Amino acid sequence: MLKTSLCDLLGIEKPVFQGGMAWIADASLASAVSEAGGLGIIAAMNADANWLRDQIHELRAKMDKPFGVNVMLMSPFADEVAQVVIDERVPVVVTGAGNPAKYMKAWNEAGIKVIPVVASVALARLVARRGATAVVAEGTESGGHIGETSTMALVPQVVDAVDIPVVAAGGIADGRGVAAAFMLGAEGVQVGTRFLVADECTVSEQYKEMVLKANDTSTRATGRSTGHPVRALKSPFTNAYAKSEGSGASAEELGAMGTGALRKAAKDGNYEEGSFLCGQIAGMVNERQSAREIVDDLVDGAEHVLKGACAWVA
């Protein structure tokens, strides 16, 4: 059985995190992943405290295993969401889109295990000094907000830079990716794109079909001029956004253009106006499965690869 120190640290059976994808990672998906032995994560996104509290209660009504909440630090509700995870005794907080330092003391004092998503060695070192339990080193292959460094390059550098467990994210969709991440020094993986087509994922049918039909060149990154690049499946929206960006549109204009685009994709299935966030690995996601089947396939596949690799060493 594939088990690392991270499993013991978090009380999970399998070293697989489900990505905290906004408008996607809700109680339905998160509870299914946690029930399968991984770490299911609810995405707080730009929602207010009441929405998050309801999602936490819904998840706990389904199961009693460890789970996490992803706090998007750019959210206008970040302060109140940061308090909700304390009030609700959330066991794990994963942070994204910023530096969580201002909240970490309170979270640590509440006994919450804090795992920031980082795209650089510098941020990994900073949050480790502030008391992070672990970090998610996320490469540019990921869907959604991205950095500039690939997973293959980022993960080993972060592993060497900090003395806490590292979770690899970006471009991982099967056991080979999991095994590769472990060989780079990671103690777990975070997977987003493959869970988009999980049976328990509540995204629109349009979104799922686009992921299933994607190939290796189906995504593009936009928004670099704003300082907040995003990777999504190519669509009329990404084409229009890239055209505006290339024409010199301001960050404010681009921000207004993107407002609500992810919701239109995830909930409405609006092909023309939706932003279908997705990682470069989408071309390997070819079938619908339950969350349990996905978690088991990731872990079993990694075990098979790692055992087979031993035969290469004389």
Roles of regions detected by a PLM:
Residues 1-165:
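Active-site entrance/lid segments in N-terminal catalytic domains of soluble metabolic enzymes
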Residues 22-23, 38-49, 136-148, 172-207:
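Glycine-rich phosphate-binding active-site loops on the catalytic face of alpha/beta enzymes
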Residues 153-167, 173-314:
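Conserved active-site-proximal phosphate/metal-binding subdomains
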